[in-house]
Amino acid sequence: MNQSDTSLIPNRAVAIFSGGMDSFTLLNELVQEGKEVFALSFNYGQRHSKELECARQVCESLNIAHKIIDITAINSLLAGSSLTDDIQVPEGHYEEENMKSTVVPNRNMILLSLAIGYAVSLKAEAVYYGAHGGDHAIYPDCRPAFVEIMSEASKLANYEPVEVRAPYLYETKIEILRRGLALGLDYGQTWTCYNGREKACGKCGSCVERLEAFDKNDATDPLAYESVCTG
């Protein structure tokens, strides 16, 4: 295989875009940096699938390529998460022990593997996802060691050295939101709540962390909430 077959296209990137505020901020930053972005969203049977409609609308407004991939066929292999099974979504702070029920087994390894394959086919230089520092306590597949090893595995598994990048790996959601607010982003275009109801619940760990981020930035969350957890 000659060099032209394996060369990657500079500034071409695949971004895993859930429709949530972290990946929304990342997507917009990549676009503003002048990257040619291909957004990739996944339906894995999550109860908060409302985020996928948000993702679709955002990509349409940004006029960027977007695919929503249905992988619900593997849902029966990934039992035990309150995000996909008939298990109550826990309430309280994002870093509390009971939030471990929101872990979907091996989720990011699966999603990143698919995104890497897509990047190889596009000759994109990197896959981006919005893992951040606040995820480390609960989600093993958002920790620095995982990102580093996944990036190395990508290079070993393919002729094309596609990197896995998580720019917010050492930042909190408070800091990520600060970035987006400085860019003038509209977070009313995003969905964070783990419950798939009409309004955000205001009590699940994801809502609590989001509301905390807005509070710490002296900003008002544009989303409507059923209630707000003050504990």
Swiss-Prot record:
Keywords: ATP-binding, Ligase, Metal-binding, Nucleotide-binding, Queuosine biosynthesis, Zinc. The keyword Zinc applies. Pathway: Purine metabolism; 7-cyano-7-deazaguanine biosynthesis. It holds the Pfam family QueC. ATP binds at residues 17-27. It catalyses: 7-carboxy-7-deazaguanine + NH4(+) + ATP = 7-cyano-7-deazaguanine + ADP + phosphate + H2O + H(+). Binds 1 zinc ion per subunit. It comes from the Bacteria. Its EC number is 6.3.4.20. Disulfide bonds: none annotated. GO terms for biological process: queuosine biosynthetic process. Catalyzes the ATP-dependent conversion of 7-carboxy-7-deazaguanine (CDG) to 7-cyano-7-deazaguanine (preQ(0)). This is 7-cyano-7-deazaguanine synthase.
